[in-house]
C-alpha cells in the first residue's frame, strides 16, 4: 500500500499527506491474526470531501451533466444514480473531487453520519460526504467495515449542536487489515449471511 501511494504521489494523482501518528499497543482494541496488520484508514486509501457550488450561480447547475451526490443519496449499497447534476464549470471552479466507480463514500454530518455507499458511477459530492479511493484494498471490505462501525462514527461526532465528524477523524481511525485474499473471503461470507437473513425475513 505504501509503495502504491508513493507511486500515485509521484504521478501527481494524489496529494502528499502529513504522516499519521504511529499506532501504539494501547490503542489496539483487540488482537488480530499474525498475518493481519493494524493501520489507520488514511493509510489504505486517498480520502477527500467534496464541495457545494454557490447556489446563486445558476451556471453551476443549469443543464449540468455531472452527478453531484448529497448525503441523503447514500443508500448503504451501490449508487447508480443521483438527482442533482452540476456543470463542467462548477467542477473546474469549485474544488470538487471526482469519485471513480468503486470509491467508498461515508456521510460526515448530521443525522446521516456513518451512512455509506459505493460509487457505481463517476460522481462528485458535497462537503458533507467523504470519499475514499482504496489502494491495494478490496473496496467492499472497507465498505462493510465502515457500515459495521457506524455507531463509532456517531459517537465521534457527538457534542456539538449538529453532530459531525471530520476527514481528519476518519483517516485516524484504526483499521484491521487482512491480506487481500482474506478480505475477499470475509466479504463473501458476509454477503452469504446477508442473503440468508433476507431469505429468513421472507418466510
Question: Model-derived features: where do they sit?
Answer:
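Low-complexity, Lys/Gly-biased intrinsically disordered segments
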Residues: 23-24, 37-76, 92-94, 112, ...
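Extended, domain-scale alpha-helical bundle/helix-rich regions
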Residues: 1-20
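Non-catalytic DNA-recognition/assembly elements of restriction-modification systems
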Residues: 24-51, 180-188, 195-203
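Specificity-determining recognition surfaces
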Residues: 148-173
Amino acid at each position: 500500500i505504501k509503495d502504491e501511494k508513493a507511486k500515485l504521489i509521484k504521478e501527481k494523482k494524489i496529494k502528499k499527506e502529513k504522516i499519521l501518528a504511529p499506532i501504539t499497543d494501547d490503542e489496539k482494541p483487540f488482537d488480530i491474526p499474525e498475518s493481519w496488520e493494524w493501520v489507520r484508514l488514511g493509510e489504505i486509501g486517498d480520502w477527500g470531501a467534496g464541495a457545494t457550488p454557490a447556489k446563486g450561480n445558476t451556471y453551476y447547475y443549469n443543464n449540468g451533466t455531472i452527478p453531484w451526490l448529497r448525503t441523503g443519496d447514500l443508500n448503504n449499497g451501490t449508487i447508480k444514480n443521483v438527482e442533482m447534476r452540476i456543470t463542467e464549470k462548477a467542477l473546474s471552479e469549485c474544488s470538487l473531487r471526482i469519485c471513480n466507480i468503486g470509491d467508498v463514500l461515508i456521510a460526515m454530518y448530521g443525522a446521516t453520519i456513518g451512512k455509506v455507499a459505493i460509487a457505481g458511477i463517476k460522481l462528485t459530492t458535497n462537503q458533507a460526504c467523504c470519499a475514499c479511493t482504496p489502494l491495494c484494498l478490496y473496496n467492499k471490505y472497507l465498505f462493510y467495515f465502515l457500515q459495521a462501525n457506524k455507531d463509532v462514527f456517531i459517537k465521534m461526532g457527538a457534542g456539538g449542536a449538529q453532530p459531525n465528524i471530520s476527514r481528519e477523524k476518519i483517516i485516524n481511525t484504526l483499521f484491521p487489515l487482512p491480506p487481500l485474499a482474506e478480505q475477499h473471503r470475509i466479504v463473501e461470507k458476509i454477503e452469504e449471511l446477508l442473503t440468508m437473513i433476507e431469505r429468513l425475513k421472507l418466510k
